[in-house]
UniProtKB/Swiss-Prot annotation:
GO terms for cellular component: chloroplast thylakoid membrane. This is Photosystem I assembly protein Ycf3. It is a peripheral membrane protein. It comes from Oltmannsiellopsis viridis. TPR repeats lie at residues 35-68, 72-105, 120-153.
């Protein structure tokens, strides 16, 4: 049974009903409707921490979705799951793919910066100050672009940048 038919709480049920109505009335192909259904089920599974199920749904959505903009969000969400699982290298691959399709995705830029910042912190712990500087520089570049696209969204990043560049 699809996840969308297993929702237990009122908000999820309401969202599912509204989404189903929209999918039925919007002039889209069956393929696009299927892609959206998989994407929606992936988001629901991801929200519940069911990452394996979410990935299965996202990969099915990717198989069906042809619009680059819509694909960017699927790829971004796959990156989020890999980030949550500590697989930062794989997460970066998906964030980069998302940005190739949608360069105006500040949340992907932010998450890339967070990973580089984390790696910079790890390099400091290992006594690799030169490597940490390179990683922090990369983080700064990605945060600057994220902030340029969404100036009010990344206040912690702005604070870090102010300290890092001064």
């Amino acid at each position: 049974m699809p996840r969308s038919q297993r929702n237990d709480n009122f908000i999820d049920k309401t969202f599912t009903v509204v989404a189903d109505i929209l999918v039925k009335v919007l002039p889209t192909s069956n393929r696009e409707k299927q892609a959206f259904t998989y994407y929606r089920d992936g988001m629901a599974a991801q929200a519940e921490g069911e990452y394996a199920e979410a990935l299965q749904n996202y990969y099915q959505a990717l198989r069906l979705e042809i619009d680059p903009y819509d694909r960017s969000y699927i790829l971004y969400n796959i990156g989020l799951i890999y980030t949550c699982n500590g697989e930062h290298g794989r997460a970066l691959e998906y964030y980069y793919q998302a940005l190739e399709r949608n360069p105006s995705l500040p949340q992907a830029l932010n998450n890339i910066a967070v990973i580089y910042h984390y790696r910079g912190e790890q390099a400091i712990e290992r006594g690799q100050s030169e490597i940490s500087k390179l990683l922090f520089d990369k983080a700064a570049d990605y945060w600057k672009e994220a902030i340029r696209l969404a100036p009010t969204n990344y206040l912690e990043a702005q604070s870090w940048l102010n300290q890092y560049t001064n």
